[in-house]
From Swiss-Prot:
The keyword Disulfide bond applies. Probably participates in a plant defense mechanism. Has anti-HIV activity. Transmembrane segments: none annotated. It holds the Pfam family Cyclotide. There is a cross-link at residues 1-31 (Cyclopeptide (Gly-Asn)). Belongs to the cyclotide family. Bracelet subfamily. The presence of a 'disulfide through disulfide knot' structurally defines this protein as a knottin. This is Cycloviolin-A. Disulfide bonds join 5-21, 9-23, 14-28. The keyword Glycosyltransferase does not apply.
Length: 31
């Protein structure tokens, strides 16, 4: 929840979800 994954999720889900990232405020975060 605090580490930006360098990916946005405005139109598509987080591809980085594969490594534990999740969508928050239109940006993908980890932890």
């Amino acid at each position: 929840g605090v580490i930006p994954c360098g990916e946005s999720c405005v139109f598509i889900p987080c591809i980085s979800a594969a490594i534990g990232c999740s969508c928050k405020n239109k940006v993908c975060y980890r932890n």
